[in-house]
Amino acid sequence: MKHIQSQNCSRTTGFKGAAFRVLACLMMLVSFSAYAQKNNVSGVVTDKNTNEPVAGAAIMVKGTSTGTVTNPDGTYTIKAGDNDVLVCQFFGYKTQEVNVAGRAKVDIVLEEDVETLEATVVVGYGTLKKTQLVGSVENLDGDKLTDRPNANVARSLQGQVAGLNIIQTDGKASHTGEIYIRGNRTSKIQTRAKAGGSSENKTYSFGTGGSALVLIDGVEGDLGMVNPNDIESVAVLKDASSAAIYGARGANGVILVTTKSAEGEKFTVSYSGSYQLNTRSVRFEDEIISDGLEWTENFYEFWQGRYATPQNPTKIPTAINTLSIAGAPKDYLEMFREKRAAGNNDPYDFKTNGEYLYFGNVNWPAIFFKPNHGSQTHDVTVRGSSKKLQYSLAGRFFDSEGLYNIGEDLYRTFNLRSKVKAQVTNWLSVDNNTSLFHSRQGQSMFSTGDTIFDQMDHHGQAPLPPVNADGTYTNSGVRSGYAQFMEGNGQWDKNLTVVSTTGLTIDFIKDVLSLRGDFSYKAIRRQRERARVPVTAMLGPASPFEYDTHDDSYKSRWTYDTDYMSANAVLTWTPKLGENHNLNVVGGWNLEDYRYHRFYIQRSGMIFPENFASYELFDGTDIKVEQNNSDYGLVGFFGRVNYSLFNRYIFEVSARYDGSSKFPTSQQWGFFPSASVGWRLDQEPWMKWSKSWLDNFKVRGNFGSLGNGAISPYTFLETMDINKTSVPFNGASNNYTTVPSPIPSSLTWETITTYDVGLDADFLKSRLSFSGDYYWKETSDIITNGPDLPNIYGASAPKGNYASMITKGWEVTLSWRDAVKLGSHDFNYSIKGSLWDTRSWVSYFPETDGNIYQLYTGKEIGEMWGLTTNGYFASNVEALQHASANGWITNTYNDATPLLAGDLKFIDVDGDGTINYGKGTLEDHGDLQRIGNVTPRFLYGVNLDFSWNGIGLSMFFQGIGKR
């Protein structure tokens, strides 16, 4: 019985255990269900400082995709569990995370993120808070440049900054272009003169010129030589107040490029690569006639009727039936049409004398140009840091194919930059920044300097192929340049630039008083080689024609060596003066030394081996050697004091005392001061009512002067060039020289004085920003040619500080940026638009005859003179009647041709009954009037950026509103 009872007991216990387990599971399910239950949680989001509600703030349940936004009154409602965490985000505020903790009402207080306004901006020899700026400075984040698929940083800057204009003369990746900030700089100005029915381009020297100063980590450099992926920020100093601390070097504005350094305390390796396919916007091959017969008929119709006029109707072609070519077996057009009718597309035939006769269908642009070409970029970056050491190494390889289908057309670059900083003690740090840039460019070229378009247009005709059936070159193949490119005519450029800066920083009082000293050395080694090879055209199997002969051939080489050294010592004092006072004082010394050497060698009349080691080994008949050297130095003492009171009233003065060896001893030094004031109205007590929507409202004004010493090192010296006579005497060329142009002993700096007023404003937690400036710039003591000397003197007019110029302009920038929740990720977007305009006038020029084709007092830079019109003549009868009534007998363009239908109706401005140019002066310019200006007006740039979940899209538009 005990045994049986034991079994029953056991069964009972097992049943109870199973029941317990089931009950436990049910309780767990109930508990889980209760835990997972989402309840409505509501609350109000307010601003910590103003206690105002924040509308449009994003509320998310952390770790989920559940979210909502606040209503106009700042309220919200969201489904959340008792233990969930709410994440609240809004542009211009710090992100807040709040535990629900079982509450049904959760209010959230957002704290303003002052990073946008308090961010530091790179300025000359230091940094300032954005709120302390009173000059015209625009700062760009490096990410704005890396998003653009350009090999050259200068192209990426185009349209990003109001007042910054980068002029590109072509689309080559190697060309940086000329960088202008706020309008025309003094330089060589081209005008187009027209007299007696002929046109002539003339260039007049007007000032020293020079592009904006580009400093890469404090060392003068080229934007085309910096890796876009390695840029931390770019600051553009546009007015005299901002650039005065750079003195003469900053006369045309300053661009400060700061490269990236190591961040954090971990070792990172990153790689990025891209491939870009470029397609020509204009496809010439689609716009020309490539059918040989059609081209011939069109050409001959024009050719046959080129002398046709209503007065000479016998010259008007009635039919295109014949075209005789010397040596052709019969009429060329007849032969062409017969071949086409028979389906014979063989382009080769023969004349009776055995020379070739061609019947091709050649698309010459398709031979010369690729429909598209590619480029690739590879970036590798290594960065790391510890408590005492920071290091980074960044490299880039860029390879771009050229546009041409033939010859060697390429551009390759390699960038490498290393940065190391060691904290030796708590008051001493040392650093080194070394960069290397190497480039190689190959390009086809004509020895005559003509463009491919000129040569191809004249000699690349549809019926004429570039090569004969046996592979030799045709006459068109040679004269178009095709043969030269295929045989090795070309130009090859190499560039190696190494820059190294070593510096030390002593913190006497941390974050208060520090001394920075550095020394930089830059070596530039450039080489250019050019070749012209003998080329022969075969007019027939036994009829060679040497186009470029053995005697015409040459190989040449240029080497350009530049060594640059600079030293800087900068003392910075930023004392802690309490909440109501901010003081930033900078003082320093700068020394620069430039040395330049050029060597040129050319060997003519040689047979080229495929590879050559030295010019001495060439089998040549003539050798030419040239060399020249130059050097100059600059030294400057500078200072800046920036003070703000109550974070409302800002005052700044800066100055530089510059010395340059380019000027005579008595004129080598110049003093260039500036002063600025700013007023932050938003910080005034009576503006508290605007705190909820106005973040910054600053008006500013400044004036300052800068010197421009961008002249050649020996301009102040009267030099005598030695040349050789072109006509030999006694069987040899002799040396000769000419009388030098006199140089005034008072030759000195050009001085640029700028006046600027501006407004900066930020609204809605810096989502909406506006900046505007109006400026007036006076350039005095411009170096240019003086009054003409008597012919008996035998030399050109001397150069001196004779002229002056005025530039006026304005610029505005408006931007909007925001972030909204899209799914579980932020969707960030920004829109930025810039518009600017500038005009320049010659306020004084030492000319007395008022020639409108030259510079004169009152001339607007870029102005164009021409005839004005009043439509076209609709018929020959109207043209003849008009000519008879007004006494106009001839066409202005060609005195031998009467006025005809389609000719322009020129307006007789001076009413003398004829169309003429007068004497081409301001007093007598006939019927000429100012009809336009070549200076770009109303330049604009629009930037659109979007990003979401690691996916980005950037769009950029730029243009000219008027020209």
Locations of the language-model features?
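Extracytoplasmic gating/loop element in the C-terminal half of outer-membrane beta-barrel translocons
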Residues: 460, 483, 538, 619, ...
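C-terminal extracellular loops and terminal segments
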Residues: 154-160, 797-806, 850-864, 925-945, ...
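Short, glycine/acidic-rich beta->alpha junctions
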Residues: 149, 218, 237-240, 249-253, ...
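Short, small/polar-rich motifs associated with maturation and membrane association
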Residues: 1-401, 405-416, 429-431, 826, ...
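Conserved C-terminal beta-signal and adjacent last beta-strands/turns
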Residues: 23, 381-383, 423, 828-830, ...
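C-terminal beta-signal and adjacent terminal beta-strands/loops
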Residues: 4, 279-280, 368-369, 691-695, ...
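Conserved small-residue
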Residues: 270-354, 600, 819-932
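Extracellular/periplasmic, surface-exposed regions of secreted and cell-surface proteins
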Residues: 210-211, 419-438, 446, 472-532, ...
